[in-house]
Amino acid sequence: AHILNYFMVAVTLIVVSVPEGLPMSVTLSLALSMNRMLKTNNLVRKMHACETMGATTVICTDKTGTLTQNQMQVYQTNFYNLKEQKLGEDELSNLIKEGISTNSTAFLDFSEEKVKTLGNPTEAALLLWLNGQHQNYLELRENATILDQLTFSTERKYMATIVQSPLLGKKVLYVKGAPEIVLAKSNRVAINGTCKPVAECKAGIEKQLLDYQNQAMRTLGFAYQIIEDGKDETFFVEGRLHDTDLTYLGIV
């Protein structure tokens, strides 16, 4: 009789210690958490996974295609001599739009309502910026004659193309790549309506690059060289630029 009494007391304590509404409260709380996570595009298949996520402090995940869509766009341009950063029909605008169009391997697909990008996302973003400036990149690319080209590589961190330019009537060498690399290969900077030696502008450009990097922005530097008639020097030697006289245009 004493054993039965002890057993009944133990069962009573267990039942009383768990509030009647606790299971329902926990279930409702987890269900609301699932609903909130779903609104942020996080689908939870099992309810108790919400509790696990709530206790998580670090998540290791792939970025491209998971957290991002592998699509880029130009946030800001800083071509030093370009007024209001809008392209026109002047020589500088011609250099910029032809350089972006020809010194690239990306394409835009206009067959659907939403423009699709093909190729390198960074180069495609530049073409989208041109399109936003009402410039036909394909027409510019087809009208120019590409004479030689160094495609981009992660080792040298730049791309270069020599074209026979119908806009300028001369051969032009266009270079784009990591700003610090392109700047190091340039002899002057087109700024404030004139050209100044790189040494006079280097500190300001490096400060600007640091500001962009602190905002987690990817940056590109642009430069060009007009090749005078009769000058048949070899600018590409063993897959690298050689003996150039570049003018730095700015940063995107």
What spans do the regions from the language model cover?
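Conserved cytosolic headpiece of P-type ATPases
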Residues: A1-V252
